[in-house]
């Protein structure tokens, strides 16, 4: 099955799977995926226990060439929305973290075998 035949939802799910594996390789533990509330959705919530950091990750998956301006995809409005969602999620947790971080992970699935990953840490 070629990458071009993937639906948007399948492409997004594939990208999130790649992102979760990438975070695990960095020593981060995924706490939640596709967490939703009435105000929106957080793609991945992960924890870096070594530094007491909780990381809210926005995943952007692209097929074909180029990342299409990954940094530009995360507008100040989007960062504000992620912050608001993060606050709602945090309010429901028993645990407390010393540091909060917002990351963006771009995943490009092309004709090559391995997806390419760009990880922008601390965008917000």
UniProtKB/Swiss-Prot annotation:
Lineage: Bacteria, Bacillati, Actinomycetota, Actinomycetes, Mycobacteriales
Organism: Mycolicibacterium smegmatis (strain ATCC 700084 / mc(2)155) (Mycobacterium smegmatis)
Highest taxon of source: Bacteria
UniProt-recorded Gene Ontology molecular function terms: nucleic acid binding
The protein, known as: UPF0102 protein MSMEG_2508/MSMEI_2448
Protein family (similarity comment): Belongs to the UPF0102 family.
Record-linked NCBIfam families: PRK12497.1-3, PRK12497.3-1, PRK12497.3-3, YraN family protein
Pfam families hit by this protein: UPF0102
């Amino acid at each position: 099955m070629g990458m071009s035949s993937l639906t948007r939802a399948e492409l997004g799910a594939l990208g999130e799977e790649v992102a979760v594996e990438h975070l695990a390789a960095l020593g981060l533990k995924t706490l939640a995926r596709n967490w939703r509330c009435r105000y929106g959705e957080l793609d991945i919530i992960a924890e870096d226990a070594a530094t007491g950091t909780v990381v809210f990750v926005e995943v952007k998956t692209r097929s074909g060439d180029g990342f299409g301006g990954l940094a530009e995809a995360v507008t100040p409005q989007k960062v504000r929305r992620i912050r608001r969602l993060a606050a709602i999620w945090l309010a429901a947790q028993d645990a407390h973290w010393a540091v909060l971080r917002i990351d963006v992970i771009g995943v490009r699935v092309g004709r090559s075998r391995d997806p390419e990953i760009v990880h922008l840490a601390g965008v917000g």
